[in-house]
């Protein structure tokens, strides 16, 4: 398990754009499970949408990418990562299946499809109550800062 303090050591993101709260399972080079507790107090709900708050799809995909970044970092053991960052490269096959609302616990599950050098190809799902809310394939690359 990886708590928020360790996530902050890995990812450069900070409030209001840090979109994972905890990693609950990590199999380096294989998969990750992480979650975000979606609360009504998030700034995004002031405008998306007043009276009918829905967590934006782009934020779901970004949270998925952040979980993938943690997976890539924790899977890379053969080099010093202190001056490295993971950049999100592509989104493919993104689908949104159900809305995410305040009070939902959004769980990210990502599996490595391919890894070559510094490039990672991942298949991700975002779930609420074990039901798929969104899915996508992502590519990321570990780069120098």
UniProtKB/Swiss-Prot annotation:
CDD domains: FabZ (cd01288)
GO biological process: fatty acid biosynthetic process; lipid A biosynthetic process
Top EC category: lyase
Subcellular location(s) of the protein: Cytoplasm
Molecular function (Gene Ontology), one example: (3R)-hydroxyacyl-[acyl-carrier-protein] dehydratase activity
One Pfam family, short name: FabA
One Gene Ontology term, aspect cellular component: membrane
Reactions catalysed: a (3R)-hydroxyacyl-[ACP] = a (2E)-enoyl-[ACP] + H2O
Keywords associated with the record: Cytoplasm, Lipid A biosynthesis, Lipid biosynthesis, Lipid metabolism, Lyase
EC number: 4.2.1.59
Main location: cytoplasm
Entry-linked Gene3D superfamilies: Hotdog Thioesterase
Family label: Belongs to the thioester dehydratase family. FabZ subfamily.
PANTHER family given in the database record: 3-HYDROXYACYL-[ACYL-CARRIER-PROTEIN] DEHYDRATASE
HAMAP family linked: FabZ
Protein's job: Involved in unsaturated fatty acids biosynthesis. Catalyzes the dehydration of short chain beta-hydroxyacyl-ACPs and long chain saturated and unsaturated beta-hydroxyacyl-ACPs.
The name this protein goes by in its record: 3-hydroxyacyl-[acyl-carrier-protein] dehydratase FabZ
UniProt source species: Campylobacter hominis (strain ATCC BAA-381 / DSM 21671 / CCUG 45161 / LMG 19568 / NCTC 13146 / CH001A)
Gene transcribed to yield this protein: fabZ
């Amino acid at each position: 398990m990886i708590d928020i303090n360790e996530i902050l050591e890995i990812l450069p993101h900070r409030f209001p754009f840090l979109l994972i709260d905890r990693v609950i399972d990590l199999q380096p080079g294989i998969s990750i499970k992480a979650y975000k507790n979606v609360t009504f107090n998030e700034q995004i709900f002031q405008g998306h949408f007043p009276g009918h708050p829905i967590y934006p799809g782009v934020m779901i995909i970004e949270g998925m990418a952040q979980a993938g970044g943690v997976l890539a970092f924790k899977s890379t053991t053969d080099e010093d990562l202190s001056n490295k960052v993971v950049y999100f490269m592509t989104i493919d096959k993104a689908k949104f299946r159900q809305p995410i609302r305040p009070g939902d616990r959004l769980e990210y599950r990502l599996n490595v499809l391919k890894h070559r050098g510094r490039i990672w190809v991942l298949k991700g799902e975002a779930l609420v109550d074990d039901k798929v809310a969104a899915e996508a394939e992502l590519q990321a690359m570990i780069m120098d800062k």
